[in-house]
Amino acid sequence: ARTVEAAALAGVDSVEHGAYLDTDALRAMRENGTVWVPTLSTIGNLRGMGRFDEAAVAAILESAMENVAAFAAMGGLIAPGTDAGAWAVPHGSLSEYALLKQALGENAENVLSRGVAEIQRKF
């Protein structure tokens, strides 16, 4: 969390992944306009694979989804991104979008459109 916080404070445009962030890191990203691409599918796609302890995978995913919801509630910028090609993350998969919609609830479309617009503006 400290490295993400430091990167945001230094003005980084976006952060990819970030499963173990805390409130200070989220706040720094929000205050500096850093777009977060949480790549939840890299965690979510591990469920039921038998490769890792299911309880551990569930706990990591739950924490990451809670952070996504908290960041959105702060007004943070979130954009979808899959890290396609990672283990169990095939190209063309929509699992990232489904997990983000689950984490963000009714506001998913609004939150994601703001994040995507900022990514397009920056890059």
Task: Spell out what each predicted region is.
Residues 52, 61-123:
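His/Asp/Glu-enriched, well-ordered alpha-helical/loop segment
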Residues 1-36, 58-78, 110:
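Histidine/acidic residue-rich metal-binding segments in metalloenzymes
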Residues 35-58:
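Active-site loop ensemble at the mouth of alpha/beta enzyme cores that anchors a bound cofactor
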Residues 6-8, 26, 48-49, 90-91, ...:
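Short Asp/Glu-rich motifs
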Residues 1-2, 20, 41-43, 83-87:
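Active-site beta-loop-alpha junctions enriched in small/polar residues
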Residues 13, 45, 120-121:
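Residue-level marker of structural boundaries
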Residues 10-11, 29-30, 51, 93-96:
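Short, glycine/charged-enriched secondary-structure capping and boundary segments
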